[in-house]
Amino acid sequence: MNLKQLIYKRLVHAKDIGGLLAKYAGRPAVFDTEAPDDKQDGWEGKTQYPRLNIVLDMQANEERSSVGSLTITIYTERTSMVILEIESLVKTCFRDLLISPEDGGPYSFAWARTDPFSIEGTNVIGQDVTFDIMEYSAQETTDPDPIVALSRYIKKLYPDSIVLGVDPVGEFTEASVTPIFYSRLVTMDKASGHNMNIVAWMDCRMAVHLLCPDKAMNLKMLAAVMQKISVDEKISFWITHQ
């Protein structure tokens, strides 16, 4: 499935959200396009609200360090009192979550803002709940690879964690259940003064990210990685080719 399909799947299968939404064709009223009009049989003559619409924009925003944005639009009737509850549940649905589609990623989501609105001339109000999307793409570079070596080093230190690039991940991975490490290459430059005819030395700067909602645990685990590297003073590189 692609990213938009997985976002739709996540929302449709969220029972706490689905229980508050209208139904269309027997399923929670979640749409990744414009909602069908009120004359469609899928509504079965019942109310069209509350309902959700998905808007996915994969245009990168360098200022916010995001690869795109996700907007979940909530529509309810003005007399309904559930819009704030649905907003809270939608935010929770994507918190501390990694989604891994077939066409990229993995991706995580950070709530950016909520914009309320009303539709003039109707009894409908709504909220646009917008998330920034961050991508945790593969960072392998060469062989031997500094990112692969660092990722395996962290996996050995924390075998029960998920290390991207080492561990397989499913469509949905909850950082609240298992901490997720991600290593990326910041810079890689040829070192001066150490090169020989058959050897070229490279200076690499790498960053380690940890997705873990427990802030105290997050700090403790990252500090342990830094301390272990400082004590060992080296990370062994595995040669991956045969």
Regions found by a protein language model. Name each.
Residues 59-65, 120-123, 193-201:
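Short, solvent-exposed beta-strand/turn "edge" segments of beta-rich domains on protein surfaces
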Residues 65-78, 124-136, 200-216:
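Oligomerization/assembly interface segments of phage tail-like spikes and tubes
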Residues 80-85, 141, 215-224:
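Short, conserved charged micro-motifs
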